[in-house]
Amino acid sequence: MSDFKTKIFPEPELEFGDQHHHPDPRLGLLQAGPLQTNLGDTIKVGVVGSALTVEKSGEFLNAIEDGFEGKTEKHPNLHPDFPGLRNQNPYRCRFEMVAAEDGVLTKGQIEKIAKEPSDARAVEMAVDAVMAQLEKLEAHHERPDVVMVSLPVKLIERVWRNERARDDEVIEDEAADAKAGRETSPNFRGLLKARAMDLRFSIQIVWEGHFNPD
């Protein structure tokens, strides 16, 4: 029996502006900015969500514009200072919320998804509803550069409920589940990311609790 030799390759550091390298993406951005800076003066941010989460997302962006200090002195690397969103931030540009009125999911849409008894159908309905708003932003005269999908609590509880169950137990054979008549539902996050790939901007899913602790 021959010996099997193993080797651990060092993890490459991330590259930032001015050929700066750093293992931590947050500290690297803070010290040198991105490898390629934004070509304009402003990064336009769109938001899709309920009327409340769209409003709170705008308030959150305004609140963090001037930056804030890190949480703790004991572990500064875990919670570094946040430099803010003005021109001197690491991205060398401003962040501006645009087309806020065009990304709102109606209360009726959210209620209908929340009350849908089928997990699979609820996920598909939620993705369809979000995609409709993303496509409106895509066609807007102020098309955003990035869009926050700010999910309200009611949608999070509905479309993530079955995913939490999947994390707790390994489903070895979904084909067997389908054959036995047991419903297999799609992954909301994966389905939305796949559907949004053709859009001309990036999306980031954000939970309501991140900017609306109440």
Residue map of PLM features:
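Long, low-complexity, intrinsically disordered terminal regions
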Residues: M1-D214
